[in-house]
Amino acid sequence: MVARFSGASDVVRVVALLQFGSAVPLGIFAATVYARQLRLGIRVPGPAIGLFGGILASVMLMASSLVIWVLSRPEVTVDAVLTHALAFLAFVTGGVGYVVGMGLLVAGIAVPALILGLMPRWLAWTGLVIAALSELAYLSMVIEPLVVLLPVGRFGGGIWLIAAGFLLPVSRAAANRRNGA
């Protein structure tokens, strides 16, 4: 573990920088979708749950990247136990913490979209499955084989958010046109 971080400290530092940078647009996306849902007249808890999840995912990703940055410091990686502990902290914040937040963000968009017909039903249902698997990923903290759910939430959730961002109507009039009203 020490060799991985101390042998490539410049690369680790760049990874931390890029990961931190990716957390900012996620938070902006969550706020933008929240505002769009309110503009669409959605007055149920879903938008607030999604906003909370998006902020949580963004903050967890930032925290993970800051810990990774600390791991790029040669004065830290001289201590093998500390390096190992910080690597676990980076993993749990950037893995479980991020994916649980991502699942809430996806659910906060998918549930109202399904109920109100704001996107194709298959896409909304796919979002619900991704959200459920993302929430179950927290069990990987005690049932280690469930870490396989982390990439489902991370990559599946990211792909789903891109699709939802394009398909979620920008106004009530657009939603009505889509639904034939």
Predicted regions and their residues:
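Hydrophobic, aromatic-enriched alpha-helical segments typical of multi-pass transmembrane helices
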Residues: 1-181
